[in-house]
Structures are given as C-alpha cells and as structure tokens.
Amino acid sequence: MVTIEDVRAIVAGLDRAYEAVVRDRVKFRVGRIVFLAFSRDERMMGFAFPKDERAALVASEPDKFLLPKPGDMRYQWVVVRLDAVDLQELRELVEEAWAMVVPKRLSAAYFATVNPDGSGNPDGSGARDAPGAPPTR
C-alpha cells in the first residue's frame, strides 16, 4: 500500500509545490491552490481532476475512486483509496493533479524532463496526449 510518505517523495520533485496542515489534514498546494488533500487517517487522498471526466473515472473503477462529498462537487476533485493504487499510479495521479494548477509551460518542462522523448510518461508509452491531460487508464 502506498502512503503519505510516497506522496511527499513525489511532491518533493514538483516545482512550486509545498505541504501545509490545515485543520489537522495534510494538503499539498501550489500557491493558495490545493491539488492534493488527505483524509485525517491518511487512507484516502483527494486530488485535482477535471470535473467533466470524473464521473467516468469513478464509474470505471468504483472500488478505487470516489466522487467528492456533496459540498465539494463544485470543485475539480476526485478521491482515491490509497490501498487500491500502486506507486506508479499514485505518481501519475499526483503529477497530473499538480499539472492542473501550474502554468502549462512549467508542467510541459517537467514532463519533458521525466521522459525526454516528449511523451510525458516515464515508461515511454506515449499514452499522454498533452501536458496537463488526465492520466490514461
């Protein structure tokens, strides 16, 4: 199972990202924008995700992904159960959430560095269409 420590290690390599504790919950931000937030027990992680694609994501893997609580439905947000993802998928979720809140040039430069062939995927699969695109499932 992945943990918050795995997320911290991933976030450490992302420009402008930092950790904050708000109301006893760990959150990761760029500026004032939250792109990751943990439940108090750190077993679930909310992450930035395109609002118009989240229903399909949750429907595709309902044991892994959840819609946000009703009060947060207005945000571009999805929740993942950490015990249901591996480290590679966690990395993709974290990187893509971060890419949603930073300037496109910054995310493009990061993904070009992660995979110099320009695909944006560390595995070189080329499945990533463009910087800031949601993770391929």
Where are the regions that the model predicts?
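Charge-dense, helix-prone N-terminal extensions
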Residues: 1-137
